Amino acid sequence: YKVSGRIQLKIVWLVAGTLVAIIILLGTGLIVGDYPIPASRAIATALWDRNGEYDFIINSLRFPRIVVAILAGMCFASSGLIFQSLINNPLVSPDVIGINSGAAVLAVAILAAGGNIGYLPWAAFLGALLTAGLIYLLSWKRGVSATRLVLVGIGVNSLLGAVITFITVKYPIERVIAAARWQAGTLFGASWGDVRTLLICLLYTSDAADE
């Protein structure tokens, strides 16, 4: 489809402004913290100085956490775009039609039951996949309409939210806290290994969004 020159210019300015904001926030994240670091030393350590006194703080703690935050946001945006394109509704996203809640149910159940946290990513993926299949089946009536799918998804989302609440009320508080922390999300412990994983996910979701 064709886009007018004025809209193209706005998109260019929007992308440029976003990149500038990301760079500024990235630099601020490297400098500011419980242990403030001079801007020149922080930038040098992040880009080329691997033997300085700030190497561990910058390259093992702050830098990977910032990059993980950026990539996670990009993955969320890509997943939202995919859903909106598939359902042809600009208001739809994984959190609205219950996919996020489906992922959270199994993950929260594992945490609350004291299960192995190594299974969390797989449990969340399985929960999201099963929820998507359930929503699709419940929406089927001589085909699937976008409106019916959205309405069913909203209902399933509410139901799964109630299940999560039940789990958090039923189990001991120390386990529930871990589940609540997982739902809220945290950058604590983020590493370059997480960056590689998110890059793979981003490449996949970006390719799917383009299609």
Q: For each predicted feature, which ranges?
A:
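A short, hydrophobic C-terminal helix/tail in secreted or cell-surface proteins
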Residues: 207-211
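Alpha-helical transmembrane segments in inner-membrane proteins
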Residues: 1-206
